[in-house]
Amino acid sequence: MELIIATRKSKLAQVQTEKVMELLKGKENVDSKKLLVMTEGDRRLDVSLNKIGGKGLFVKEIELALLNKEAHGAVHSMKDVPFELPSEFELVAMPEREDIRDAFVSLNGSTLSNLRKGARIGTSSIRRAEQLKLFRDDLEIVPIRGNVQTRIKKITEENLDGIILAAAGLKRLGMEDVISDYFDPKVFLPAIGQGALGIECLKGGEFNDYFKALDSKEVRTTVEAERSFMKVLNGGCHSLIGAYSEVKDNDLYMIGTFTVNNRIVKKDILGNKEDNILLGKKLAEKILEEV
């Protein structure tokens, strides 16, 4: 038996899927292969995500492959997965979470704090751009899209002083050496689910249990809390929304940020990790009290 796993065509997506394939072989002794899918988000690199529909752009075609029984499961970056899945699907496993931090990449090793006044920083993320302005309101934000390698090339092609990328992607690609600095995730809040992988299947799929065996309870606890926070705020690519969460013993600590009436609001919450979804909801409600 050989399971078929659908994923995007990018090098990072393939590396992430290969990690899941290794886990399947190691834990379940199951062979698998990739089905590469071109998504709308990959095709439309000339337009900012917030202008063409946001997160679902990276999953719809992959879900279609599942519906058509072309694949048994799909691997996503959790930060790309909308907070509401179509009723036919479920997230059966969240097997691992890499470094959740954002990373600063510059050609000469400069950090954000020692850049020249008016430095040009590449990012198309509203979350990153708005938080950057809190650190340095003199910076010029330049929209860039593309895969990791393409964005790094744009530092020279577009005369940028640096770009911001997810540390997880760089580490998974073996490119940690290009990182000039890391952002403190409790200050510069990551995207919802950043660094985490998710495995999506059709509900009731014959082979779902193989994927479910890869689930990490701690990763699911944190990511579900963050997605609960996002669901209440209806956040996506159109607004600043970020969260940091961590499990310590039986506790879950979480920080969230969101734009309310053109003002960036940040709150935190602490509670029992078993109440993770409720805690995410309560944190969002604390922020909305600022309206």
From Swiss-Prot:
- List the cofactors: dipyrromethane
Q: In which pathway does it act?
A: Porphyrin-containing compound metabolism; protoporphyrin-IX biosynthesis; coproporphyrinogen-III from 5-aminolevulinate: step 2/4
Enzyme Commission identifier(s): 2.5.1.61
Where does the record place the modification S-(dipyrrolylmethanemethyl)cysteine? Answer: 237
Fetch the InterPro entries from UniProt.
HemC, Porphobilin_deaminase_cofac_BS, Porphobilin_deaminase_N, Porphobilinogen_deaminase_C, Porphobilinogen_deaminase_C_sf
Supply the enzyme class, top level: transferase
Q: Name one GO cellular component term.
A: cytoplasm
What CDD domains has UniProt attached to this entry? PBP2_PBGD_2
GO BP annotations of the record are: protoporphyrinogen IX biosynthetic process
Source organism's superkingdom? Answer: Bacteria
The record's catalysed reaction(s) read: 4 porphobilinogen + H2O = hydroxymethylbilane + 4 NH4(+)
State how the cofactor is bound: Binds 1 dipyrromethane group covalently.
**KW 4Fe-4S (keyword) present:** no
In its UniProt record, a GO molecular function of this protein is:
hydroxymethylbilane synthase activity
Quaternary structure and partners: Monomer.
Q: Please explain the role this protein plays, according to its UniProt record.
A: Tetrapolymerization of the monopyrrole PBG into the hydroxymethylbilane pre-uroporphyrinogen in several discrete steps.
Q: State the similarity comment.
A: Belongs to the HMBS family.
Which named protein is this? Porphobilinogen deaminase
Organism, scientific name: Clostridium perfringens (strain 13 / Type A)
